[in-house]
Amino acid sequence: MAMLSNLMISHPEVQSFEDLERLVIEVAKSGEIFLEMDLKPDYPDTPRTWIARLESSFYRAEHIDRMNQ
């Protein structure tokens, strides 16, 4: 299980919500099947719908990756 806080700590190069969304997609494609939203991202561009956006990105990336196998 990937925890959002661990992803953010492990990747200090992530400086925006958009960067974080790309990282979440990479994590899903690497084989993670769960993503825990344990911390709200504190980036200036974090939308109010941040949970839905990250969940959607994670699920779509995982689903598309499985279809391509």
Model-derived features: where do they sit?
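Metal-dependent phosphodiesterase/phospholipase catalytic core, i.e.
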Residues: 1-69
